[in-house]
Amino acid sequence: MARPRLDLTRAQVLAFRQHVGALDVRLPPGPHSLRQAAWAGLQDSMPRAALLSIHARVEGTKPDTWADPSLVQLWGPRFSTYVVAEQDRAVFSLGRLPDDGDSRRAAEDLAARLVAFLDGRTMTYGEVGRGLVVHPNQLRYAAPTGTVLIRWEGARQPTIRAVPRPMVDPRDARLELVRRYLHVFGPATADSFASWAGIRPAHARATVDALIESLTPMRTPIGDAWILTEDEPAFRIAHSGATAARLLPSGDAYYLLQGSDRELLVPDPGRRAELWTSRVWPGAVLVDGEVVGTWRRAGPDVVIQAWHRLSAGDRAAIEAEAASFPLPDVQGGIRVRWDGRHGSARQATKRPEIDRAATSRTIPNRGPGRIPTNSARKSSSPIAAAPTTDRKPGPSSRSPAAGCL
């Protein structure tokens, strides 16, 4: 890697990721904003995770927003369930098509058999597995051909349907997938891209090398990494502070991290173990740009485990965020429970705080409130125009989900 051009602080990295991830100011409703919210895909491996990720980024989100005609569901990075923009289907499918001949032929052959068997029908993946005499979980290996879409709502088996293959060169799709990753998760490395995308490290490194002329090396507290050169100015300016509170669902892109990137987001190793568990991850509580705890939901009950004592204002903001969840299965309002007592005298001096024993409070489900947003701007993409926001950064002194669903 070339000599880094800029030393980035932790605050700069997190502020940039929050800004490009639309976690500082919610976007206005509409397909353009949905595509931007899903710029690196929305993992939907837990029921309604993608919906709550959209809610954290787009105002006016409704219970059926995840099923908007502009969005589709597929097996994407790491063969996990993802919601992506229909016009970006090639990026998240063909962008992961294996490079080696044997693996690619296996994917193409399975996809051809699947398409022929479906013959225009939509069927459960169990039915398709029995029809093709393969384990249903193997069907996801056909997804990188771009010809397979799924529909999964959490309660039943996913259904599968075949669609025409996108008219995009897989190499171009792979390059765009790297660009998406570096824009949302940057600064990042080829190896971290490989881990996120679920492809071989050697293939990831080759793709990054192909983009080297459009990348800039940066030094971060966890090591040297790449950013898109076009993103460099955004790292040098002070972004507006993060909105008061966001409740990010299990697997949300903001903390869908591995290795040292987790250390950057959550420096305390004990807290990292609470967020990135060995089983289903809880959701992350984001307040003023910092992860301050975890949350889980069961029906109307949202249980919040804070990592230190919070101010009355922070608590109110978190409860209001929970109350606005656009969930179809909540009748009579969300009930928030604060789990345990947290914070030390040293932590309590950071801001006016209150002591929190385990308490619960029922909040009417008012649905998503409208939050002021700014206008949208356009950016270029080799495959399709990239929607990004024209949220002019302003000066700020701030640095920058049983499952939770």
Task: Label every PLM stretch briefly.
Residues 1-131:
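Phosphate-backbone binding and catalysis cores of DNA-processing enzymes
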Residues 60-68, 132-141, 201-207:
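Short amphipathic alpha-helical interaction segments
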Residues 107-115, 171-178, 315:
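Short, leucine-enriched amphipathic alpha-helices that occur as contiguous helical runs
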Residues 139-211:
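Loop-centered beta-sheet repeat module
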Residues 273-351, 355:
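Glycine-rich, small/acidic residue-mixed loop/short-helix segments
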